[in-house]
Amino acid sequence: MTRDMDLIRLLLLKLEAEPLDGNLWRLDLDDLGISDYTHDEIAYQMVLLIDGGLLDGQRELSGGFVARKLTWAGHDFLDSVRDPAIWAKTKDGAKAAGGFTSDLLKALAKGLLKKQIEEWTGIKLDL
């Protein structure tokens, strides 16, 4: 199975919007309202989110997931790709380069956001 950055982004957006049940999310993947992907595809991307340090959580023996929170890195990544127009440009840039890593996607999205902020404010950012 391959990493699907569109699904990764969608999962982060969904998780961020979910209310916490106490200090945990107990996630039944079928209840997330993601109909364009199979249960196995969603589960695999959840494992990648945890392995990649974007989500603090674990898979339960039942096959569900328990998550404590999006990590700082998870919030940073999501903030860099939240805007649909920035996300589309980020993916286009990655495709033109012939490949990508999550760090490259984040850096590309961050660069696009930086450019957009500089255009809106007239303030040059040194990031």
Enumerate the language-model features and the residues they cover.
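Short amphipathic alpha-helical interface segments
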Residues: 2-34
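Non-catalytic, well-ordered alpha-helical scaffold segments
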Residues: 5-9, 43, 68, 72-75
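Generic structural signal for hydrophobic core residues of well-folded globular domains
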Residues: 15, 49, 78-81
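Exposed, interaction-prone assembly regions rather than primary DNA-binding/catalytic cores
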Residues: 29, 87-127
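Basic amphipathic alpha-helical segments that dock to polyanions
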Residues: 41-53
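Short beta-strand "wing" residues that participate in macromolecule-binding interfaces
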Residues: 57
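Short, amphipathic alpha-helical interaction segments positioned at domain boundaries
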Residues: 66-97
